Amino acid sequence: FQRGIGDTTDVVQKEMYTFDDKGGRSITLRPEGTAGAVRSFLENGLCNEALPQKVCYLTSCYRYEKPQAGRLREFHQFGVECFGSASPLADAEIIALAKSLFDSLGVKDLSLEINSIGCPTCRAEYHKALKEYFSSRKDELCDTCKGRLDRNPMRILDCKSPICHEIAKGAPVVIDYLCDECREHFEMVQKYLKAQNIEYTINPQIVRGL
C-alpha cells in the first residue's frame, strides 16, 4: 500500500491499521481496493490477455480515522478499473459510469469536479513551482504541511487546515504546467464529457491519491 498510494498520503501516515500478529509478522488491514485489484490483475495473468481489461469489485476496507456521519472505520469500496489503456476515452467512460450509477440510484444535486495532474515530467516542473510558492509562506503552514513541502508539495493543496487552504488558493495551477500531450489528453476528456452532456467544473486543487 505504501508503494501504491505513497508514503506521504494521509492513508499511510495516519489511517492504516498496522500491527504485528502473534508470529511477529507486520499485518495491515486493507485501506482501499485499488492496490488489491492491480495485484489480482497481475497475479492472474490478465495482463497477458487482450487489452484493455475492464474490471469491477466490491470489497470491505478499514481506515483509522475519526468516525463521523456517513464515514465509519469499516466501509465498503465499489471500484472500477480499466487496465491497459491510457486513452482519454477510458477516463471519460469511468466518469460517465459513475454518473449513470448515481442517476440510477436517484441521487440528486450532484456536482462533478475534474482535474489533471499530468505525467511525471509535468509534475516535476509543477513541484518546483509549488515549492517556491509555499516556501515563501512556510511559517504560516501547519506542521504537517511543513513536512510535506520537501517530500510532496502537491499534498499541501489537499490540507484541511483553514490557514493552509487559504494559502493554497494563491498557489500555481497544475493545468498551466501540463505538457502538450497531457494537455491534449485533458482536453479530449472534456470533449467526451460534453458529448455525453455531462456537466463538470475544473478544480485545480484536486490532487487526491498522490
Sequence positions of predicted segments:
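TRNA-recognition modules of translation machinery and tRNA-sensing kinases, especially anticodon-binding
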Residues: 1-210
